[in-house]
């Protein structure tokens, strides 16, 4: 988004040479297996770049189980990866967006697949949950589905990611921009963190930017630094058909933004070439949405359904105080639940709405627990 400068996880701006701060996580999954893994967190690596606060560590750093039941290899495999071969594969990724490989893009591919490969494993796992949400919004506006990888570089696929300048959510909306695109932000709800609503808002904004610039690389640059700066870069360049034509006149962080996006598209599709496999994140395989008819706390819902309240908050990060105000939201209030909980919710709906509290401990956990200490990933 515009008006913010930061990096997420393993992304380093072009020219940065310092290591990424990370947490060494001792992860305990639901089977009781403990393994130490390095999970990068955003850190200040250059003057002007600020970190992102990852607040849902439970899910972001949860299980080390891969989709195949094995811990992924930590050794990068070197496939046949000349720029010509990568460029040929990249051109097969999209019919609507032009993506090519050059030295800048290759730098980010290397970072995703080498120093940042553990982060890539987690991002692949989280993408299985979030991509269907993104794709639905992108299809609604007739946009390239490849844009679903934009939150990879915006937020590390973390709806609770918050930049120091106040950008929030998967798509990193500033409050003013979020309200411009009809996202409700108040003391009870922040729809910038709502995966579904923020995705529709982001798709609408990207559609507007593409209509303005007529090129997806320029639209992406404008999403990062704002249309004004892109127009200024075009003027300084004496006109420009795409991002690469105005590259030298863009802000430093934006020069790395589009190459990082292109690299993310490539790696998220060809990760197997680098011996990278998705990690299970503890997020449910499928979710559905129910309408909330009365004010209710997430703690009450979790207690009646036998869920862990932190799991429920992770699926519904937009509710700032853990309280759903049924008639205080735009449209109707919604609650996202694992699909297997929908019928149970309907069955016990009246009990959920009863004005009573309980101290009973929830008895189901869908994510692992962890302990951590600071470490460094190079």
Where are these regions (language model features)?
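Short, functionally critical alpha-helical segments immediately adjacent to catalytic or ligand/cofactor-binding
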Residues: 143-160, 219-226, 265, 312-316
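Bacterial N-terminal signal peptides
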Residues: 9-17
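Second-shell loop/turn segments in exported
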Residues: 113-124, 134-136, 140, 159-167, ...
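An acidic, Gly/Ser/Thr/Pro-rich helix-cap/linker signature
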Residues: 6, 19-141
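Primarily a LysM-type cell-wall glycan-binding module
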Residues: 279-306, 360-378
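Secretory-pathway/luminal and periplasmic proteins that interact with or process carbohydrate-rich
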Residues: 156-164, 180, 209-212, 227-240, ...
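Substrate-binding/active-site groove segments that recognize
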Residues: 165-187, 199-201, 206, 230
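Extracellular LysM carbohydrate-binding repeats and other cell-envelope/extracellular binding modules
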Residues: 250, 315-352, 374
